[in-house]
Amino acid sequence: GRDLCPSCATRRMVDVSAHMVDQVLPRVQHRQWVLSMPKRVRWHLRHKPEVISGLLTVFLRAVETTIRQRSPGAPPDAHFGAVAFVYRFGSYLNSHVHFHVLVTDGVFSAGPDGEAIFHPALDLERKDFEAVQAKLRHRGLRWLHRHGFERLARYCARRPAAGRRCWCGSTNASRSGARSAA
């Protein structure tokens, strides 16, 4: 396939990045979040697309709730922007489904004339990341249980599978004045 050639994969990555910056992403601060799941969950992610969409939705809602709470002046119906990339392999081409998500570092609300108003989030603190992890763990286990994966949910609820599997990059200033993920 096209992604087995390093030159082709690099060119495609550069093209997608340029398109995202030029055409899709608003000129606001962004942060990259990476989510990896316990190994037992990865098999289900690989073979059952509904698990990918379900757990990614749970993750995005947990992040959005935390960012909204950290955005002063944001109304309760404000939303963030996010672009998720599902990676299916690790760096050694091992099967390893995980998510890289680019998220606005704040939320948007509708102004009086319908224009989008950006409410930047305050700097996230360790407790904010821990809150996302706690929400993800609780809601993710509940999602698995509700969708017929009770045994898997019980396995994931015990240590060490219940450990930290979420990473969030810091924000840095970019050439355009917007902040991007590190």
Language model feature labels by segment:
Residues 1-182:
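Beta->alpha loop/short-helix hinge microenvironment recognizer with preference
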